[in-house]
Amino acid sequence: MAAVKASTSKATRPWYSHPVYARYWQHYHQAMAWMQSHHNAYRKAVESCFNLPWYLPSALLPQSSYDNEAAYPQSFYDHHVAWQDYPCSSSHFRRSGQHPRYSSRIQASTKEDQALSKEEEMETESDAEVECDLSNMEITEELRQYFAETERHREERRRQQQLDAERLDSYVNADHDLYCNTRRSVEAPTERPGERRQAEMKRLYGDSAAKIQAMEAAVQLSFDKHCDRKQPKYWPVIPLKF
């Protein structure tokens, strides 16, 4: 008898109540809770905008110039004067604290805001307690292939980014030679400036290296002073073979 009742209950139970769809319904309820809190926050923002003391109906505000373009200057001036002379102006609000017409609405909205804030706190606490259980998740062959393909794409993208960075670092502008180093760094230099050049001159000229290096420096300074005043850019060496 019990087996018959169990079989009938399984037959009458809808298909979407199967435990396989538990995670789906869990995510659905979380999304609906987020949407409800979003609607509540939007409604609170609109109510706070319309219930502020400085808000007045549209009949008391200056009309747009598109309503009456011919009488725009005078009508705008009249509305502006009426707004200043109106007893419910900003100075009146500052003296009385708030408009009597909207005081009851503000109090009611404050109570509603407190109730909504409590509901949102309860929703956030319940959302924090919810955890996704992945122990019963079935790992199929298609899912394994998907993960492997994703990892392969990530590795290819990482390798391509490294190649692009190396190509950008090794790029030489047309007005620079191959030994021009334009990199800047805040780290201390690995070797003393001119040490490599001094060792090369010592190897080439022996004891006369210092004298020849001084002569080269003098010639270079003279060239920079008299001949290289405007420092023209070198024409890029491009083979013109069409």
From Swiss-Prot:
Pfam families, sorted: GEMIN8
Residue list for modification Phosphothreonine: 124
Sequence segments annotated as region (Disordered): 94-130
A GO BP annotation: spliceosomal snRNP assembly
Extent of Basic and acidic residues compositional bias: 110-119
Keywords carried by this UniProt record: Coiled coil, Cytoplasm, mRNA processing, mRNA splicing, Nucleus, Phosphoprotein
Cysteine pairs bridged by disulfides in the record: none
Superkingdom, natural source: Eukaryota
Feature: compositional bias, Acidic residues: 120-130
Subunit structure: Part of the core SMN complex that contains SMN1, GEMIN2/SIP1, DDX20/GEMIN3, GEMIN4, GEMIN5, GEMIN6, GEMIN7, GEMIN8 and STRAP/UNRIP. Part of the SMN-Sm complex that contains SMN1, GEMIN2/SIP1, DDX20/GEMIN3, GEMIN4, GEMIN5, GEMIN6, GEMIN7, GEMIN8, STRAP/UNRIP and the Sm proteins SNRPB, SNRPD1, SNRPD2, SNRPD3, SNRPE, SNRPF and SNRPG. Interacts with GEMIN6; the interaction is direct. Interacts with GEMIN7; the interaction is direct. Interacts with SMN1; the interaction is direct. Interacts with GEMIN4; the interaction is direct.
Function: The SMN complex catalyzes the assembly of small nuclear ribonucleoproteins (snRNPs), the building blocks of the spliceosome, and thereby plays an important role in the splicing of cellular pre-mRNAs. Most spliceosomal snRNPs contain a common set of Sm proteins SNRPB, SNRPD1, SNRPD2, SNRPD3, SNRPE, SNRPF and SNRPG that assemble in a heptameric protein ring on the Sm site of the small nuclear RNA to form the core snRNP (Sm core).
Protein name: Gem-associated protein 8
Organism: Homo sapiens
